């Protein structure tokens, strides 16, 4: 893990407890009850799935790196800890987060190109005038206090690959687990190396043939709940009959490392519940609710 | 707890109104400098906030007469993000960043001096060398700040005297992180993107030879150049920059390479095995061929350069506190090592005998120094921080090399 994560603004200013996040969201609701009852929105994770799919669309033609999409997702999360979503045009926020993240992750895109691309997908929500995006960039940077450097679990994953002699399948799977964790609150709750360890455990323990969970979430969620939790529970019990050697090696490493096992288990649970709720995802539904909200509140103006 | 959300001035979440106003918090006392990206002003804190500040304003682009939001430059974004993250006694201290009126205001602690100004002062009215203990303290602090940057995975990429700030109490602060970037970013990042980096006189030979793979070694070459300049009061490799042609291809910096060769000798594959695979290798060969045999020294003449530099500066040629001596030469030669893979690192440099021998190093580079450096020049011709959105071409204070370097920097953004 990066030596400088410990001193980073991410650790000092952008790690929340679950309770604190819940408080923030509750205070948004308290402050604008009318909007909340008038414009119900899907579960935050379903919205996140929707946002991430929009980001992927945006990034497609611009050969954007995965890491930039991940950074954009973190920016969106941070921004919405400071702003009630119902007071914003989420399409503009998503586009701006993308534009800003591309600059930060060293794959910059011209503002005109980003706006044109966004208008391809959501002409009714993005104005042709680039200054709207420029203004939103100010809002984003200001809400984040210019703290734009994001530490991601991907790096820990590649650092641990040789140490744990992970196969390329395992790495690919862990990688996609990391991609998925951006759909939850986990990036605001845990340090990146905890997420990386969680992703590795999931990958090694399940070794499924599929390279991505998407679409096959439910069986995996089940398997993780039944099998994974047992294995995790057995982590402390080093004298038991124990899991297969491959997994034992990982268990041994975990015991040696100073990684917080409890945190890793909590992360796994978050992921399981993501895969469960994923079953209810409907792109159309998200689009309709967001569209109604933006249009009737004139948030796109 | 969440009072900030109740700001009545704030329109919808994506519209923007600054919560903090520069002029409510700072009193602008004058104008310091104007660079490619904007202007630097001197300011005093208001409302009980003590201290002096330097406010760097990134100019907004103008479209016609009205200033518009046009998206921030990548350079501004990097500088803002890095300065918010970094915290070290030898790196310039950021106070806050204010986004207001479509412009960015980075508020830094004020530093009374910089190395360009200090070096310049020692040439006026006639040359008088910078005392050896002061050079040693400057270099130590500079390397210490650089070690911090490198262990934080940050390459500075534009180290030069104008960007090395010095406080009135003699502390060195590495400034101007406008070109700095993180180097752990994987894959293509350090190959693609910006092509030209570092003001040409301080540019490492591997960059001149067309390498697009930046490593921390590029910064250490620049430190070597700065070390030499502190001793001789002149840029050691003062080449002329070949301008980018209309096709925006980066030309081979023939003249700059020649200046290096004149002192360091022709780089060969024996001392720098990687050189044969560098993009500009054939250019280097034709450069060598274009001159009469023996025109360029076969081997390094740095020691000769160093000895005459000591002599001209009135430094003792033996050893002692009055001279950088033989240890200083050894360190210089390791910083100005052709092969980037063999060049000394910041960590190693800090442990070099030049610092280990010869007693304690003061954290105040002026300690024991009798002289006085003039204050930074602050002018009144433009201290309206709000209207000054057009970049001035004029620099107050000293003539500077930086405009030249930045001209090419602009092209790559
Ligand atoms: N903290 C500071 N205190 C006092 N003066 C400063 C400070 N920071 C910068 N300056 C002055 O302003 C000049 C320009 O600052 P800086 O290098 O950060 O901006 P820049 O736009 O990148 O300029 P350039 O293109 O000239 O390199 C410095 O060389 C120095 O003279
Ligand atoms: Mg500068």
From Swiss-Prot, chain A:
Superkingdom per UniProt: Eukaryota
Cyclin N-terminal domain residues: 53-142
Keywords for the protein's UniProt record, in alphabetical order: Activator, Cyclin, Nucleus, Repressor, Transcription, Transcription regulation
GO CC annotations on file: nucleus
InterPro entries the UniProt entry points to: Cyclin-like_dom, Cyclin-like_sf, Cyclin/Ssn8, Cyclin_N
CDD domains named among the record's database cross-references: CYCLIN_CCNC_rpt1 (cd20513)
GO biological process, one term: regulation of transcription by RNA polymerase II
Subunit structure: Component of the srb8-11 complex, a regulatory module of the Mediator complex.
Described function: Component of the srb8-11 complex. The srb8-11 complex is a regulatory module of the Mediator complex which is itself involved in regulation of basal and activated RNA polymerase II-dependent transcription. The srb8-11 complex may be involved in the transcriptional repression of a subset of genes regulated by Mediator. It may inhibit the association of the Mediator complex with RNA polymerase II to form the holoenzyme complex. The srb8-11 complex phosphorylates the C-terminal domain (CTD) of the largest subunit of RNA polymerase II.
Record-stated family: Belongs to the cyclin family. Cyclin C subfamily.
Name of the protein described by the UniProt record: RNA polymerase II holoenzyme cyclin-like subunit
Species of provenance: Aspergillus oryzae (strain ATCC 42149 / RIB 40)
Lineage: Eukaryota, Fungi, Dikarya, Ascomycota, Pezizomycotina
UniProtKB/Swiss-Prot annotation, chain B:
Subunit structure: Component of the srb8-11 complex, a regulatory module of the Mediator complex.
Catalytic activity: L-seryl-[protein] + ATP = O-phospho-L-seryl-[protein] + ADP + H(+); L-threonyl-[protein] + ATP = O-phospho-L-threonyl-[protein] + ADP + H(+); [DNA-directed RNA polymerase] + ATP = phospho-[DNA-directed RNA polymerase] + ADP + H(+)
GO MF annotation terms: ATP binding; cyclin-dependent protein serine/threonine kinase activity; metal ion binding; protein serine kinase activity; RNA polymerase II CTD heptapeptide repeat kinase activity
Family the UniProt entry places it in: Belongs to the protein kinase superfamily. CMGC Ser/Thr protein kinase family. CDC2/CDKX subfamily.
Keyword Metal-binding in record: yes
Function: Component of the srb8-11 complex. The srb8-11 complex is a regulatory module of the Mediator complex which is itself involved in regulation of basal and activated RNA polymerase II-dependent transcription. The srb8-11 complex may be involved in the transcriptional repression of a subset of genes regulated by Mediator. It may inhibit the association of the Mediator complex with RNA polymerase II to form the holoenzyme complex. The srb8-11 complex phosphorylates the C-terminal domain (CTD) of the largest subunit of RNA polymerase II.
Pfam families xref list: Pkinase (PF00069)
Domain Protein kinase residue range list: 26-355
Keyword set, alphabetical order: Activator, ATP-binding, Kinase, Magnesium, Metal-binding, Nucleotide-binding, Nucleus, Repressor, Serine/threonine-protein kinase, Transcription, Transcription regulation, Transferase
EC number: 2.7.11.22, 2.7.11.23
Start-end of Basic and acidic residues biased regions: 376-385
Cofactor(s), names only, from the UniProt record: Mg(2+)
Entry's transmembrane regions: none
Name used for this protein in its record: Serine/threonine-protein kinase SSN3
The keyword Ribonucleoprotein appears for this protein: no
Classification via CDD domains: STKc_CDK8_like (cd07842)
UniProt-annotated catalytic positions: 158
GO cellular component: CKM complex; mediator complex
Binding site for ATP: 32-40, 56
Cell location: Nucleus
Positions of the UniProt region annotated as Disordered: 376-413
Enzyme class: transferase
Gene3D superfamilies, per database record: Phosphorylase Kinase, domain 1, Transferase(Phosphotransferase) domain 1
Gene Ontology biological process: negative regulation of filamentous growth; negative regulation of transcription by RNA polymerase II; nuclear-transcribed mRNA catabolic process, non-stop decay; positive regulation of transcription by RNA polymerase II; protein destabilization
């Amino acid at each position: 893990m990066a030596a400088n994560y410990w001193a980073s603004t991410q650790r000092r200013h952008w790690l929340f407890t679950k309770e604190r996040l819940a408080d923030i969201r509750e205070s948004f609701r308290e402050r604008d009850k009318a909007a909340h009852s008038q414009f119900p929105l899907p579960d935050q994770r379903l919205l996140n799935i929707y946002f991430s799919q929009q980001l992927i669309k945006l990034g497609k033609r611009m050969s954007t790196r995965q890491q930039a999409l991940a950074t954009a997702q973190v920016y969106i999360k941070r921004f919405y800890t400071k702003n009630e979503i119902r007071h914003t045009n989420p399409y503009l926020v998503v586009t701006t987060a993308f534009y800003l993240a591309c600059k930060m992750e060293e794959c910059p895109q011209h503002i005109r190109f980003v706006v044109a691309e966004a208008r391809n997908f959501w002409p009714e929500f993005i104005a042709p005038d680039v200054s709207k995006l420029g203004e939103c960039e100010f809002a984003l940077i200001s809400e984040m206090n210019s703290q734009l450097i994001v530490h991601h679990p991907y790096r820990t994953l590649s650092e641990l690959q040789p140490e744990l002699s992970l196969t390329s399948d395992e790495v690919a799977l862990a990688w996609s687990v990391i991609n998925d964790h951006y759909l939850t609150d986990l990036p605001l709750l845990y340090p990146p190396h905890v997420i990386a360890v969680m992703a590795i455990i999931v990958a090694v323990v399940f070794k499924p043939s599929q390279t991505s969970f998407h679409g096959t979430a439910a069986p995996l969620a089940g398997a993780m709940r039944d099998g994974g939790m047992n294995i995790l529970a057995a982590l402390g019990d080093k004298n038991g009959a124990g899991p297969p050697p491959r997994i034992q090696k990982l268990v041994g490493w975990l015991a040696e490392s100073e990684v917080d096992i409890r945190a890793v288990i909590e992360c796994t649970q978050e992921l399981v519940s993501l895969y469960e709720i994923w079953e209810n995802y409907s792109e159309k539904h998200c689009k309709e609710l967001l569209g109604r909200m933006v249009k009737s509140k004139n948030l796109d103006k | 707890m969440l009072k900030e959300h109740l700001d009545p001035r704030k329109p919808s979440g994506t519209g923007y109104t600054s919560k903090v106003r520069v002029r409510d918090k700072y009193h602008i006392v004058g104008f310091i400098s104007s660079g490619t990206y904007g202007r630097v002003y001197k300011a005093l804190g208001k409302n009980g906030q003590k201290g002096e500040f330097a406010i760097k304003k990134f100019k907004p682009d103008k479209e016609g007469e009205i200033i518009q939001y046009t998206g921030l430059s990548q350079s501004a974004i990097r500088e803002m993000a890095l300065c918010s993250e970094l915290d070290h006694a030898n790196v310039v201290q950021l106070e806050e960043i204010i986004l207001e009126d479509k412009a960015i205001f980075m508020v830094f602690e004020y530093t009374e001096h910089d190395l360009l100004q200090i070096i310049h002062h020692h040439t006026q009215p006639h040359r008088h060398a910078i005392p050896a203990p002061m050079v040693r303290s400057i270099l130590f602090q500079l390397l210490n700040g650089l070690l911090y940057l490198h262990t934080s995975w940050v390459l500075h990429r534009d180290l030069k005297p104008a960007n090395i700030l010095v406080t009135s109490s003699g502390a060195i602060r590495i400034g101007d992180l406008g070109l700095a970037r993180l180097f752990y970013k994987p894959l293509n990042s350090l190959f693609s993107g910006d092509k030209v980096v570092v003001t040409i006189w301080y540019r490492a030979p591997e960059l001149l030879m067309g390498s697009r793979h930046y490593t921390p070694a590029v910064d250490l070459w620049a430190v070597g150049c700065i070390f030499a300049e502190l001793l001789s009061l002149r840029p050691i490799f003062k080449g002329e920059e070949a301008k980018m042609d209309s096709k925006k291809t980066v030309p081979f910096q023939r003249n700059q390479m020649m200046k290096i060769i004149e002192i360091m000798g022709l780089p060969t594959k024996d001392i720098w095995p990687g050189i044969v695979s560098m993009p500009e290798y054939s250019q280097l060969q034709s450069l060598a061929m274009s001159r009469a045999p023996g025109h360029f020294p076969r081997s390094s003449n740095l020691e000769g350069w160093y000895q005459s530099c000591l002599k001209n500066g009135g430094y003792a040629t033996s050893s002692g506190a009055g001279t950088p001596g033989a240890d200083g030469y050894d360190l210089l030669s390791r910083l100005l090592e052709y092969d980037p893979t063999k060049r000394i690192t910041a960590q190693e440099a800090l442990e070099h005998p030049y610092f280990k021998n010869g007693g304690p190093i003061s954290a105040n580079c002026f300690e024991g120094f009798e002289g006085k450096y003039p204050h930074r020049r602050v002018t009144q011709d433009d201290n309206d921080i709000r209207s000054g959105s057009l970049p001035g071409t004029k620099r107050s204070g000293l003539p500077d090399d930086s405009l030249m370097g930045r001209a090419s920097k602009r092209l790559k953004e």
